[in-house]
Amino acid sequence: MQRFLLPLLFLALSPPAICHYSSSTSSPSSSSVSSDASEWRPARATYYAATNPRDAVGGACGYGDLVKSGYGMATVGLSETLFERGQICGACFELRCVDDLRWCIPGTSIILTATNFCAPNYGFDPDGGGHCNPPNKHFVLPIEAFEKIAIWKAGNMPVQYRRINCRKEGSMRFTVDGGGIFISVLITNVAGSGDIAAVKIKGSRTGWLPMGRNWGQNWHINADLRNQALSFEVTSSDRSTVTSYNVSPKNWNYGQTFEGKQFETP
C-alpha cells in the first residue's frame, strides 16, 4: 500500500453562523459531467488515508473544515503543474482509472473539487518518488474517493482527467474575517467553473473596490467597511460574473458567513 500524505495547513476555525440576506439561485445537488466538458488528459493519482478528523481541516486553498464547508471527502490535492499557485482552487475535475485491468473498477469515474496542493519533493526525480514534481500532472485523493475508481493496492495509478462544470447545492458563501480596516473574505461553494479570477466588494457607502487574492480562495482588502451592508461581485475563470447585493446587514461581525447568488450551470 502506498500512502501519500498532503501537506495540510491546520486552521483553528470555529463553525460560523450562516446568515441569509439576499436571494440566490440554487443548482442541482449532485455533480455530473457537463455537455462542454474538456477532453480527457493523462495523469497519475495516489491516495492518503485520513486517520484523524483534523486531516479534513486546512489545505492550501483555505477552505478550513472541508466537511463543514460542504466539500466533504470528494476533494483532491493537485501537483504544482496543475495548481496554478492557487488560482485553480474550487475547480472540479472528473477522474477515471485507465490502463490497468487488475486494479481499475470498470465503468467508473469520480468528480472532485480542488482544495489542496501537493508540494514537490526535489529529493526525488519526477519519475521516482517525486510524484508531484514538475512536469508531472498528479492528483492526491482521500482513500474514500480513490476506492471509487480503483482498488487501493494500485498505489500510483494511471488516470485520465478533465475539467468539468461544478454543480453545487445552494448559494455561494462569503465568510468575512479580519480586524479593523483589514477585511479577508473566504468564498466557498462556487458553481460553474468553480475557480475565481476576480472579486470586488462594496459597502453601502462606497463604490466597488477590487480585492486581492491573499491565498487560495481568500481575498483581502484594506478598507473601513464597518457598519455598512456588504455586496460582492465575483468573476470566475470563464469570465462569468455574479453580483450579490447587500448579502450582509450593516451590523455584520467578523467570523460570520453570508449567502449570495450563485453561478448558473448548464
From Swiss-Prot:
UniProt xrefs under InterPro entries: Expan_Lol_pI, Expansin, Expansin/allergen_DPBB_dom, Expansin_CBD, Expansin_CBD_sf, RlpA-like_DPBB, RlpA-like_sf
GO biological process: anatomical structure morphogenesis; plant-type cell wall loosening
Residue stretches making up the Expansin-like CBD domain: 181-260
Pfam assignment, any one: Expansin_C
Domain named Expansin-like EG45: residues: 58-171
Keywords carried by this UniProt record: Cell wall, Cell wall biogenesis/degradation, Membrane, Secreted, Signal
Membrane topology summary: Peripheral membrane protein
Known function: Causes loosening and extension of plant cell walls by disrupting non-covalent bonding between cellulose microfibrils and matrix glucans. No enzymatic activity has been found.
Similarity comment: Belongs to the expansin family. Expansin A subfamily.
Identification of the protein by name: Expansin-A13
Organism: Arabidopsis thaliana
